[in-house]
């Protein structure tokens, strides 16, 4: 895979340039564009993934299905599709917007900062997973209600962006509705 970049944003969310992805994620991470996706199977179960230990930020942490950064000229939806293929080896239904204005800043235990405008999407797959071990070290298909209960009970076990997304009542309602419509 070619070198990925992030799209830098000003405080109003307007693109101002690009920076190589790994150079962008430091203790002083600039605001940039990302996306987050929750992937469901035909049973309405959510794919929860555990980030590979080689990941720069939040290694070994459980998170929603796929996250990443759109490339210059690429739509968020196309970026979700690209990363699902790359990380999980699956084809998905067209991603649906769940939480379009999600924005967060969080610092991992190693001091790496995420500072992102990060629209949230949901999609479905019926494909068998072909996990990329460089991205994902473990995964589980779970009922959404069980995942949300786990996040509420033990937020420290999940990525901060997943916890913050699940804390939004409208996003939670839309994810629940999405899971139920197989």
Swiss-Prot record:
> At which positions is Mg(2+) bound?
67, 87
Q: Which pathway does the database say it acts in?
A: Isoprenoid biosynthesis; dimethylallyl diphosphate biosynthesis; dimethylallyl diphosphate from isopentenyl diphosphate: step 1/1
Q: Which UniProt keywords apply?
A: Cytoplasm, Isomerase, Isoprene biosynthesis, Magnesium, Manganese, Metal-binding
> Any idea what this protein is called?
Isopentenyl-diphosphate Delta-isomerase
One GO molecular function term of this record is: metal ion binding
SUPFAM superfamilies xrefs: Nudix
Which source organism does the UniProt entry give?
Shigella boydii serotype 4 (strain Sb227)
* UniProt similarity note: Belongs to the IPP isomerase type 1 family.
Where does this one sit in the cell? Cytoplasm
